[in-house]
């Protein structure tokens, strides 16, 4: 029998020695997430990212992050069924500057509107804003009983549904095509587009619960820091993006009157 050292015993050092535990959070930094100036509450939260190490830069890891925030948190409001997606486009110091990336209705709101004895009408359209953002807007509306109606059901005829859908697409296209992204978001916050559609379709068939239920961002123009700074209420010459904690409030309450239609 060959006499020698047992390599397996000596190799591992002290048997049962515990590995040194390193706290992963010691290598990470907190960054503030800033919403654009269209919203009342600018500081929407904090995010965690691994500190810059060698070629791996922390700010590159943050760019492209999408945050989904309830409109109630952004506007300090009670109405909480709209969710806005904000994407990080640039990092200035410890601030992540975000831009609009999409909108959605909450699942419970959508389910609460779908009922029996009424017609659900949906439409979608792809539109480009004046500053080059391509958006896909989805709209939903429901028929309602007329004032003196006795019958339980309020179903629209197929021809009426087509007319309403056409009107929905026309209004959505007009409202987005003639405005830039900032103005479109200002219309989505109180959902004035939905109110416009409801008023315009009144002569075809009375509608209720008309909402732009979803907005998708399909294409963006080339990133410009100056434009992002303007969205955050700062001039392009400014270097830091601290900004105020509050933005400008969009005043369009329930009593909002849409413009009068020339032709229906």
Curated annotation (Swiss-Prot):
Modification(s) after translation: ADP-ribosylated at Tyr-155 by PARP1 in presence of HPF1.
Location of region: Disordered: 232-264
Membrane listed as a keyword: no
Single Gene Ontology MF annotation: structural constituent of ribosome
A GO cellular component annotation in the UniProt record: nucleolus
Record carries keyword ATP-binding: no
Protein name in UniProt: Small ribosomal subunit protein eS1
Residue(s) carrying ADP-ribosyltyrosine: 155
UniProt keywords, alphabetically: Acetylation, ADP-ribosylation, Cytoplasm, Differentiation, Isopeptide bond, Nucleus, Phosphoprotein, Ribonucleoprotein, Ribosomal protein, Ubl conjugation
Subunit and interaction comment: Component of the small ribosomal subunit. Mature ribosomes consist of a small (40S) and a large (60S) subunit. The 40S subunit contains about 33 different proteins and 1 molecule of RNA (18S). The 60S subunit contains about 49 different proteins and 3 molecules of RNA (28S, 5.8S and 5S). Identified in a IGF2BP1-dependent mRNP granule complex containing untranslated mRNAs. Binds with high affinity to IPO4. Interacts with DDIT3. Part of the small subunit (SSU) processome, composed of more than 70 proteins and the RNA chaperone small nucleolar RNA (snoRNA) U3.
Cross-linked sites for Glycyl lysine isopeptide (Lys-Gly) (interchain with G-Cter in SUMO2): 34, 249
Comp. bias (Basic and acidic residues): 242-255
Organism of provenance: Macaca fascicularis
Residues recorded with modification Phosphotyrosine: 256
Sequence positions bearing Phosphoserine: 236-237, 263
InterPro entries in the cross-refs: Ribosomal_eS1 (IPR001593), Ribosomal_eS1_euk (IPR027500)
The protein's role, per its UniProt record: Component of the small ribosomal subunit. The ribosome is a large ribonucleoprotein complex responsible for the synthesis of proteins in the cell. Part of the small subunit (SSU) processome, first precursor of the small eukaryotic ribosomal subunit. During the assembly of the SSU processome in the nucleolus, many ribosome biogenesis factors, an RNA chaperone and ribosomal proteins associate with the nascent pre-rRNA and work in concert to generate RNA folding, modifications, rearrangements and cleavage as well as targeted degradation of pre-ribosomal RNA by the RNA exosome.
Any Pfam family matching the protein: Ribosomal_S3Ae
Source organism, top-level taxon: Eukaryota
Sequence positions bearing N6-acetyllysine: 34, 56, 249
Gene Ontology annotations of biological process type: cell differentiation; ribosomal small subunit biogenesis; translation
Subcellular compartments: Cytoplasm; Nucleus; Nucleus, Nucleolus
Family: Belongs to the eukaryotic ribosomal protein eS1 family.
